Design a protein with these regions (language model features):
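Periplasmic/extracellular, small/polar-rich flexible segments of pilin-like filament-forming proteins
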Residues: 62-149
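Internal alpha-helical transmembrane segments of multi-pass membrane proteins, especially GPCRs
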Residues: 9, 14-18, 39
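Alpha-helix exit/C-cap motif
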Residues: 40-44, 51-73
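Alpha-helical hydrophobic helix detector
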Residues: 16-33
């Protein structure tokens, strides 16, 4: 005869609720960090696209001896005709619109404007000039060019 009671091994409701709370706290901490990393990777892609557009502008200058005529608006500004108009350059989702502005025969300014899911990026609009000056416009308080470029 056995006087031992059968022990059952299982989770109690309280233990399960503690696990759910811990997972919720971890997710609450991790998700904003994840979003920041995703935005940063899209920003890196936009910087690469701006540099690609800069190379296309130089190629256009080599062929035409002017920067004029590289855009869709009056041939000088707006979306580029010498390169892709958005970043990423492939796919259907657009995170940055590329534009050309302030074009003369010897200078230009390029911009990557965040759109869609990237519209709330703390760096705002990334700009690049024909002399290689990198800048940001409409950035959040305390954000510097060094943080974004």
């Amino acid at each position: 005869m056995s006087f031992y009671k059968n022990k059952q091994f299982a989770f109690t409701l309280i233990e399960l609720m503690i696990i759910v709370v811990i997972i919720s706290l971890l997710a609450g901490i991790a998700y904003p960090s994840y979003q920041e990393i995703v935005m940063k990777s899209r920003r890196v892609d936009a910087k690469g696209a701006l540099i690609g557009l800069e190379n296309a502008m130089e190629r256009h200058f080599t062929e035409s001896n002017t920067y004029l005529g590289a855009g869709t608006v009056g041939g000088n500004t707006g979306a580029p005709t010498v390169f892709f108009a958005s970043s990423p350059t492939q796919g259907s989702v657009v995170y940055y619109q590329l534009t050309i502005s302030a074009v003369t025969a010897t200078s230009y300014s390029l911009a990557a404007t965040p759109t869609g899911l990237q519209a709330n990026d703390k760096c705002g609009i990334l700009t690049l000039t024909s002399v290689g000056v990198k800048d940001i416009v409409d950035e959040a308080n305390g954000v510097t060019v060094g943080n974004c470029w």
